[in-house]
Amino acid sequence: MTTESYTIKIRRPDDWHIHFRDGEMLRTVVPYTSHYFGRAIVMPNLLTPITEVVSAKAYRGRILAAIPEGDNFQPLMTCYLTDTTESSQIEIGYKEGIFTACKLYPANATTNSSHGVSDIKNIYPLLAVMEKLGMPLLVHGEVTASHIDIFDREARFIEQVMEPLRNQFPALKVVFEHITTKEAAQYVLEGNNNLAATLTPQHLMFNRNHMLVGGIRPHLYCLPVLKRNVHQEALRAAVASGCDRFFLGTDSAPHAQQKKESSCGCAGVFNAPSALPAYATVFEEMNALPHFEAFCSLNGPKFYGLPVNEGFIELTRKPSTVIEHIDCNNEKLIPFLAGEDARWDVKVTD
């Protein structure tokens, strides 16, 4: 691994999994994505979830209003699936270009998921509609039964939910989001072209020791939680393999500092300001930079059936200090790698 300065140029990337929140938080964080990314799949888990076309249109409007002048960015909206979601909302939203995909949250799996699906069979009729439309299903892949250890929830999800689901709907396009385990990585590698996965920078850079040894680091706490080193290494090997069904999804999820640094802290890593340097660092460490552009900019559009972005960004191998905090509504947001020297500096070239 060299420390010499050099520059790589890639197609403008996309973020296939992000949380913008709403209100002042949305207005604060959107520019950190819109400046560098061409598109982003926007998660629908607001306090009042995005379950209908009308609410998706309104939310998209609020996002568009937060994009700084000059940024060429398109938010791609998703529908939050519930036990009572109407298939007409999915079909109309997809055909009108409002919904790009639907999101499956097992009930109570993560932030604002209490409205999620209680039993996957409850939405089988919806999945049949999606399969017919060619509409992707985005999956938070964890079971939530109280007796299952939090570190085992993803692996158990594959056995109990994902495999039966894919057997029932073999033509359904499925994104296994923010995978964290060797079991998930292997499952996707062995899958067909209808199965893909996103990976976050924190799960590629760190494991649970980084979060827990020598003191708890709450700004590394997210769901699914960081796992053992063996799982981290499996994720790194997966992206380094060049498999075109792995792509960038930051799962950037901002919370105010006081909500992270508390006796019962919120799950979520706000990584939008530092995600691209972090990903580049991992690919460099894995001697996989030849696959970096595909992971960031090509694999996602291929899976979703969308054109690649026309613009470009440049990443230069030189230190660039990550901002320590971002002010938001009289509170602070602490970004991923806050105050640290990232190895890469990023700029837009078009």
UniProtKB/Swiss-Prot annotation:
Record: residues binding Zn(2+) 1: H17, H19, K103, D251
Cofactor: how and how many bound: Binds 2 Zn(2+) ions per subunit.
Amino-acid positions noted as binding Zn(2+) 2 in the UniProt annotation, renumbered to this chain: K103, H140, H178
Any one GO biological process: 'de novo' UMP biosynthetic process
Sequence positions that bind substrate: H19, F20, R21, N45, H140, L223, H255, A267
Catalytic residue positions: D251
Pfam families, per the entry: Amidohydro_1
Pathway assigned in UniProt: Pyrimidine metabolism; UMP biosynthesis via de novo pathway; (S)-dihydroorotate from bicarbonate: step 3/3
Function field: Catalyzes the reversible cyclization of carbamoyl aspartate to dihydroorotate.
Name listed for the protein in its UniProt record: Dihydroorotase
Protein source organism: Photorhabdus laumondii subsp. laumondii (strain DSM 15139 / CIP 105565 / TT01)
Gene name linked to the record: pyrC
